[in-house]
């Protein structure tokens, strides 16, 4: 017997005691963030029918919890798009939010620390209707913020939101990450531009997937340079598409081996010393945490992003205006990442002032290359 109220782990053989598991994670200073997607999912032909999910979909239609078409029927994500055939919750409807988050309240109660709010770009048609009066044309950009804003209202102050999509006001729903990239050399420059663009919109905390999310496993060279870049952005993470995931046709990876962990890269490329090399950068990151923490607090108080293109702080400096591949992380660290394949050295612009090499401790006077 299933009811629309049965949304918990109680009957799952995979998670017999999630509350105890979360408590043990917290004892090790590990926080748990759960992935979310704003859909009433249409199951695939290869999935076992979930009666609980079907009940939830039927309930959403009956009570008008989902976005509608002009004729009043539920809008479904068009074929050829992610989660095709799924319906979308209408977060402008107070009853939708009450139902949606009522089914997730127990997650916060048991200690879940936040949510990774993926998706948010599912409005592909203009003639759609929302409870709050918004049309599909207006919602194509705004839905992402309606969605993440609803989650922000649901969370406690100590919880975190980790989002991909956004619109005007996205700075109020941190953290954000740059979405899914392929493991290709050209992507590293692009992802840096995405981070600096996000900073200029006021987003304070930003991240990306080290060396890409999908496609063939990155080379040690790409992974090394991506890790070095990630060490000096607000949030450092590696992440990868699961085997047989959504990009298996568009960006095929290595069969059964998509994991982007440092040790898997070392194993796949037969370079055992690579793990220790990456450990150096991860330890450096941990040693930077006091600086990053104080910088994050400062940015919240002063409404400034942590990661800033040089032009943000040196607006009258023509060289700073032209610098597309350097940035500040807080007030004291200037990062100039290696973005080209097999690159080991590069030139950079130092703004006015005295600068010190992080590793060499050598002093450099600014206002020159």
Where are these regions (language model features)?
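Catalytic-domain carbohydrate-binding cleft regions of carbohydrate-active enzymes
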Residues: 1-369
């Amino acid at each position: 017997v299933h009811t629309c109220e049965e949304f918990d782990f109680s009957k799952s053989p995979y998670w017999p005691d999630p509350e105890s598991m979360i408590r043990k994670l917290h004892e090790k200073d590990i926080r748990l963030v759960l992935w979310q997607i704003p859909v009433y999912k249409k199951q695939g032909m290869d999935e076992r029918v979930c009666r609980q999910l079907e009940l939830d979909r039927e309930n959403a239609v009956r009570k008008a919890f989902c976005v509608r078409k002009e004729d009043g029927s539920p809008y479904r994500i068009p074929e050829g798009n992610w989660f095709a055939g799924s319906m979308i919750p209408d977060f402008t409807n107070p009853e939708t939010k009450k139902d949606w988050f009522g089914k997730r309240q127990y997650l916060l109660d048991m200690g879940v620390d936040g949510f990774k709010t993926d998706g948010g770009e599912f409005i592909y048609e203009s003639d759609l209707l929302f409870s709050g009066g918004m049309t599909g044309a207006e919602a194509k950009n705004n839905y992402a913020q309606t969605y993440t804003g609803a989650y922000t209202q649901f969370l406690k102050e100590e919880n975190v939101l980790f989002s991909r999509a956004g619109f005007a006001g996205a700075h109020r729903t941190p953290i954000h990450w740059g979405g899914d990239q392929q493991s290709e050399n050209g992507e590293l420059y692009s992802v840096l531009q995405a981070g600096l663009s996000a900073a200029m919109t006021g987003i304070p905390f930003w991240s990306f997937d080290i060396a890409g999310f999908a496609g063939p496993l990155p080379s040690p060279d790409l992974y090394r340079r991506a890790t070095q870049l990630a060490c000096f952005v607000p949030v450092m993470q590696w992440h990868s598409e699961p085997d047989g995931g959504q990009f298996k046709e568009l960006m095929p990876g290595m069969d059964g081996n998509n994991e982007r962990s440092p040790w898997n890269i070392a194993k796949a490329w037969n370079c055992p010393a690579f793990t220790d090399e990456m450990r150096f950068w991860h330890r450096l990151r941990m040693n930077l945490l006091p600086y990053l923490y104080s910088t994050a607090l400062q940015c919240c108080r002063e409404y400034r992003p942590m990661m800033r293109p040089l032009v943000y702080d040196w607006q009258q400096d023509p060289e700073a205006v032209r610098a597309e591949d350097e940035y500040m992380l807080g007030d004291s660290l200037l990062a100039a990442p290696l973005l080209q394949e097999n690159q080991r050295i590069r030139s950079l612009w130092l703004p006015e002032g005295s600068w010190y090499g992080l590793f060499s401790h050598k002093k450099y006077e600014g206002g020159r290359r």
